[in-house]
């Protein structure tokens, strides 16, 4: 058989195309190379002339060349360095032995607890749950926080956002939710956080107990690709446990820094900046991640809380606006409430849970609605009450709100260590409204 015919037949069954090439051009967040033809999402590696290596993911595939974004920094790389194909798509280790461990988005443990014994490698990018395979959210997901359980009740498989400016208490609230919920598995993605905040979150907010937790960490000094895929890696871990029939709590801090990472990548690729400099891909990436959470028929559930950092407490920020439109509820933290010493500073009037009315009883629903109505009356007339312009007896409902003001504020405030069962929260709510 002629050599050319043999090669053609072999090509039908095996990929004989070259798996190495060379660097052609290096830019701040993207490297261009040629020599082989990878697909978008494939993982490649640069072998630098100084002997070090740099791993990256293909984000541009053209006929004559391809571009990839590095997972780590590319100092020392130069045109002509060898580029090798590593694997098709990014995978991440999963298994029960991940519990209690802290990993980076490359699947490397960073907790000094020895090598990781994992079950298998799972793809990082997967298809969200099909709409008709999603289970109805009909069970309560208690988080141990009075104002959430009583007034913004969450359900198993619900997706919620925690919206707040910097320094208002997002991390503290997320720690309370993690410790207060009854989910057997908790997966936490810390994306774009300062390095010192990682041990602080573990020791202060989680009280050092990681027995039921898996942490995936990409700090602010990591590359944009690490920060982007850290969130997807954590979601893949949550999906593994969900597919085992378990209820999983997924916590991510923060969506804003995740979107900022994609903004850096998108702008490097030449995407046009739109609102506040975010390219279209930064906004379209959000549902790809968030829709993977939820409840699936004949499997478990992923109940997700995504924190969103809003600049200057501006809820019209494009990332905050897009996130709110995707999720099933939003919890807004108010800087004003911190001035009154109310922690966690949840603004119940600006917050909402879209499934609450479907999972609590009619009497519980009436209690929650009445509390919000009385609290809204207090806020609307706060100035009149403070300056003494309101006379008791003019409005029966406002009179009731004024009498119950101290009790309502006491209900909204909660020490971070004083977590309590769902039933206790509603008993206290009923006692206030009697």
Curated annotation (Swiss-Prot):
Its EC number is 7.1.2.2. Keywords: ATP synthesis, ATP-binding, Bacterial flagellum biogenesis, Bacterial flagellum protein export, Cytoplasm, Hydrogen ion transport, Ion transport, Nucleotide-binding, Protein transport, Translocase, Transport. It is found in: Cytoplasm. ATP binds at residues 164-171. GO terms for cellular component: cytoplasm; type III protein secretion system complex. GO terms for biological process: bacterial-type flagellum organization; protein secretion by the type III secretion system; proton motive force-driven ATP synthesis; proton transmembrane transport. It is an enzyme of class 7 (translocase). This is Flagellum-specific ATP synthase. It comes from Helicobacter pylori (strain ATCC 700392 / 26695).
């Amino acid at each position: 058989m002629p050599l050319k015919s043999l090669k053609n037949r072999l090509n039908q069954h095996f990929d004989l195309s070259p798996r190495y090439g060379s660097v052609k051009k290096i830019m701040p967040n993207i490297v261009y190379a040629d020599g082989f033809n990878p697909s978008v999402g494939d993982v490649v590696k640069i072998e630098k002339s100084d002997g070090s290596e740099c791993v990256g993911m293909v984000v541009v595939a053209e006929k004559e060349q391809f571009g990839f974004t590095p997972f780590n920094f590319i100092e020392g790389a130069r045109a002509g360095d060898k580029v090798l194909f590593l694997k098709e798509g990014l995978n991440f280790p999963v298994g029960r032995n991940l519990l209690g461990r802290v990993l980076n988005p490359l699947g490397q443990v960073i907790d000094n607890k020895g090598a990781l014994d994992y079950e298998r490698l799972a793809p990082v990018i997967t298809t969200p749950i099909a709409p008709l395979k999603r289970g109805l959210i009909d069970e309560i997901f208690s988080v141990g926080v009075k104002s959430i359980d009583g007034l913004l009740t969450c359900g198993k498989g619900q997706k919620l956002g925690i919206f707040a400016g910097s320094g208002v208490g997002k991390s503290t609230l997320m720690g309370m939710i993690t410790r207060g919920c009854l989910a057997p598995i908790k997966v936490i993605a810390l994306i774009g956080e300062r390095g010192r905040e990682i041990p602080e979150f573990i020791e202060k907010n989680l009280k050092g107990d990681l027995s039921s937790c898996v942490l995936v960490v990409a700090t602010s000094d990591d590359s944009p690709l690490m920060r982007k895929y850290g969130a997807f890696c954590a979601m893949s871990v949550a999906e593994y446990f969900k597919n085992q029939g378990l209820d999983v709590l997924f916590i991510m801090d923060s969506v804003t820094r995740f979107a900022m990472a994609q903004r850096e990548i998108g702008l490097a690729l030449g995407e046009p900046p739109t609102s506040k400099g975010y390219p279209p891909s930064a906004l379209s990436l959000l549902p790809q991640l968030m829709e993977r959470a939820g409840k699936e028929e004949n499997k478990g559930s992923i109940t997700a809380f995504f924190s969103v950092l809003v600049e200057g407490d501006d809820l019209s920020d494009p990332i905050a606006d897009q996130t709110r439109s995707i999720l099933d509820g939003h919890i807004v933290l108010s800087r004003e409430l911190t001035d009154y010493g109310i922690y966690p500073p949840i603004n119940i009037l600006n917050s909402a849970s879209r499934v609450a009315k479907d999972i609590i009883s009619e009497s519980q629903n009436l209690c929650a609605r009445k509390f919000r109505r009385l609290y809204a009356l207090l806020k609307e007339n706060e100035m009149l009450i403070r300056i003494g312009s309101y006379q008791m007896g003019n409005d029966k409902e406002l009179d009731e709100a004024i009498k119950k003001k101290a009790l309502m504020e006491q209900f909204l405030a909660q020490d971070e260590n004083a977590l309590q069962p769902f039933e206790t929260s509603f008993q206290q709510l009923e006692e206030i409204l009697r």
